[in-house]
């Protein structure tokens, strides 16, 4: 059991995090984990360094683990780069699990997703969890496809970003 909450608001111009509301919800002892979408899906909002740092500090204060869902990190507007949650501070790095999927490079069905965990104790727990059912074993085609996408897919990805920006409503 847990509590589902949203702390993102829209002021007519931009989406933002209500940090007062977030802190009230983090103070609830019934919950211990926060899922952060970065960039946010479906709005595409790339959270700035200050917001990510503040989220990290607040979650550490209340002993919250942050699962940072960064599966859309490649699909940003042209010339806009996302900021990985774990890259902002040591606190964020040691108190988070980052999930990245290669959906944008059309590798969704190949088991090429990544889980990044810097904290050794937390990484051990994650490894045990994903290896219990052997779901962490990519096939040989997935490895080759991922390598090709990362080494030869930049131009294609840039063109995809431009196309998405053109057709955006």
Specify the residue positions occupied by each region the protein language model found:
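Aromatic/hydrophobic pocket-lining residues that form π-stacking "cages" and hydrophobic walls in ligand
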Residues: 55, 85, 169
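Substrate-binding/gating loop at the entrance of the active-site cleft, primarily
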Residues: 1-5
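Active-site phosphate-binding strand-loop segment of PLP-dependent enzymes
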Residues: 10-80
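Residue-level signal for well-ordered alpha-helical positions
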Residues: 78, 88, 128-129
């Amino acid at each position: 059991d847990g509590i589902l909450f949203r702390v993102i608001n829209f002021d007519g111009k931009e989406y933002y995090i209500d940090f007062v509301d977030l802190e009230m919800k983090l103070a609830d002892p019934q919950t211990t984990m926060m899922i952060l979408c970065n960039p946010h899906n479906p709005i595409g909002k790339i959270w700035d360094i200050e917001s990510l740092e503040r989220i990290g500090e607040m979650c550490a204060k209340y002993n919250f683990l942050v699962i940072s869902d960064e599966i859309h990190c490649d699909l940003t507007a042209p010339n806009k780069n996302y900021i990985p949650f774990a890259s902002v501070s040591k606190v964020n790095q040691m108190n988070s699990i980052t999930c990245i999927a290669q959906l944008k490079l059309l590798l969704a069905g190949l088991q090429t997703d990544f889980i990044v965990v810097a904290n050794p104790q937390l990484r051990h727990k994650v490894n045990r969890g994903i290896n219990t059912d052997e779901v962490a074993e990519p096939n040989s085609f997935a490895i080759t496809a991922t390598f090709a996408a990362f080494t030869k897919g930049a131009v294609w990805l840039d063109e995809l970003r431009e196309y998405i920006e053109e057709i955006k409503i």
